[in-house]
């Protein structure tokens, strides 16, 4: 996922299914980042941190939607 991540406000407008799909994509991206880090081919380590934060943001909004 190379594009800029949506803000929490934008994420709140998405459906629960869309959020689950985005969370799955971010988990896959994190897995790829982990493999790249282990092989030494991760160009920008800050991207891994950003992906972790993006996943946390998506999961937070998803939890808020399911409890509401």
Curated annotation (Swiss-Prot):
- Identify the stretch annotated as signal peptide in this record: none
Q: Where is this region: Disordered?
A: 32-68
What Gene3D superfamilies does this protein map onto? 1.10.287.310
Q: Does the keyword GTP-binding apply?
A: no
Instruction: List GO molecular-function terms, semicolon-separated.
Output: structural constituent of ribosome
What is the protein name stated in its UniProt record?
A: Large ribosomal subunit protein uL29
The similarity annotation says: Belongs to the universal ribosomal protein uL29 family.
A GO cellular component annotated for this chain's UniProt record is: ribosome
Bias (Basic and acidic residues) ranges: 45-56
Per UniProt, the keywords (alphabetical) are: Ribonucleoprotein, Ribosomal protein
Where are the coiled-coil regions?
none
Gene Ontology biological process terms, A to Z: translation
């Amino acid at each position: 996922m190379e594009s800029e991540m949506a803000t929490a406000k934008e994420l709140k407008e998405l459906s629960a299914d869309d959020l689950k799909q985005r969370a799955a994509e971010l988990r896959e991206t994190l897995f790829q980042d982990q493999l790249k880090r282990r092989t030494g081919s991760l160009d920008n380590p800050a991207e891994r941190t950003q992906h972790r934060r993006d996943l946390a943001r998506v999961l937070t909004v998803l939890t808020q939607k399911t409890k509401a």
